[in-house]
Every structure is written in C-alpha cells, then in structure tokens.
C-alpha cells in the first residue's frame, strides 16, 4: 500500500525548526487534516512532505510512491488569471501530457458550465479555490495536498468540497488538508494532526474525539 511515513521530523527554514517531533503515517484511503493557527507551520510541513523543503532533521520514507503521484494546491494562485477555466485545464493537462475532458474536470468540482468560458480573474474567491482543486486533481495523484481549501467558500461550497474530498478518498487516495478553521472541517477528516506552539500531535482516530477541546488545550 502506498504510504508516507514520518519519524521524529522537524521542519523549518535554514536549520531553524518551526515544528518538531512529528511522527505520523499518511495512508491511502484517508483524509488527514493539519489543524492549527496561522503561522504554526502547517504549510511548511506540507512542503517538506512534498520534497520542496529539506527537513531540519528526522526522516521521511515514501513507500510504493514517488513525486509523480503527489499533487498540491499550495502557494495560490497556480492558475492563469487571464485564461478561462476551460483553458486553464487544457494548458495544465497539456503540460503534464494528460488526456482530460475540460468540461468534465470543471464539472467534477461544481464549477457551473456558464463559468467555464469566463476568465479566471473574474471568478469569485470560492470559485478560484474550486479551480485550484480541479487543477490539482487532473493527474489523479495518490497523495493530494490542499492548503486552506475552504477559503472563500460559502456553505454550499463547503458541502461540495467535503463531498469531493470524500469521493476522492473512497477511490483509494490520500487527501491532506490544512486549516485554521476548526468548525468548518468538523466531520471531514478521518484523522488529524494538531500543529501548535512548535509541536505536532497526531490523532489517528477521531471517533469520540472533541477536536475543539484538544485544539484549545494545546
């Protein structure tokens, strides 16, 4: 089974750790949430897992997977603002050599057909987030990393996002999301990593766990 295993990991910049003592395993068929306040190190941890940043210390092991099976929506925006939603999909698909139907790809993240031909710069904040998700999903990665994907989404958008992530998980993939908005992700992840005050606490099973109590106690 594809997996990413982390042992005694410290992440940061220029050998200065931001978060230390990280131990967890990312398995396919799971949604994992990195939960913590802004600036806690969630994005730094994501970038380290993706191989974009060298760890300060510790080990990351990639089992039955490689960088081509990982995708991310981090450092927004990654889309082209002066291209339409449909053109964005076509350009990214062509770059990666993917055979993708742009209309179906945009439909899958609930971008309405009337917006497919509009320039991305004219999309609402929530619709831009959906486009970012669409582009990250094009390669059908085994490990999908999403940084604050709920930003700008209204309640209907959150319902749509949750359904999309669960469906992708149920296809046998791993989804890692980061957020600082506790109430908006309740019921979405299967497990959680609370990142706070330079530490990371992995909760592998959320059944019976009150995330609010745990989060505010750290």
Region locations from a protein language model:
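The feature captures the beta-strand-to-loop junction immediately N-terminal to the Walker
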Residues: 35-37
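Conserved ABC transporter NBD signature motif
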Residues: 51, 55-68, 202
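Conserved ABC ATPase "signature" region
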Residues: 90, 100-115
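Catalytic Walker B motif of ABC-type/P-loop ATPase nucleotide-binding domains
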Residues: 144-148
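H-loop (His-switch) and adjacent beta-strand-loop-beta switch element
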Residues: 192-205
